[in-house]
Amino acid sequence: MAIKVIVELQAKPGKRAELKSLIESIVAKEGAGQRGFLGSTRYEVLDSPDMLVEIADWESAEARAAHMQEAAATGVYAPLSEMLAAPFRVTIIRQLA
């Protein structure tokens, strides 16, 4: 069953544009080739200038879990930590049946 992954990222002060650019670069380089990845969109948070939210669509929780295992092994997301003011928050949701 398809899922959505909501990722909330708090950039260091004044670094949201750089964080957005880095995420877009990673998605462009890694996203299209990931099995089960259907795409993602990034959003700004109107009352929090350093917050960025990404909503990603996956074919299944299993496809995302496989991707995250591979990402942990390769360190593809490691550069993000340098730009974050706090650990990112992930919420995984699926449509009610």
Predicted regions and their residues:
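Absolute protein N-terminus
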Residues: M1-A2, A97
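Short, well-ordered beta-strand segments in beta-rich or mixed alpha/beta enzyme
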Residues: A2-L9, G39-M68
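Non-catalytic surface loops within mature trypsin-like serine protease
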Residues: A11-P13, S60, R94-A97
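Terminal low-complexity, poorly structured segments
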Residues: K15-E18, S48, L80, I92
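An amphipathic, aromatic/His-enriched active-site/gating alpha helix that lines ligand/cofactor pockets
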Residues: S25-G39, D57-T91
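A short beta-turn/loop motif at secondary-structure boundaries
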Residues: Y43-S48, E82, L96-A97
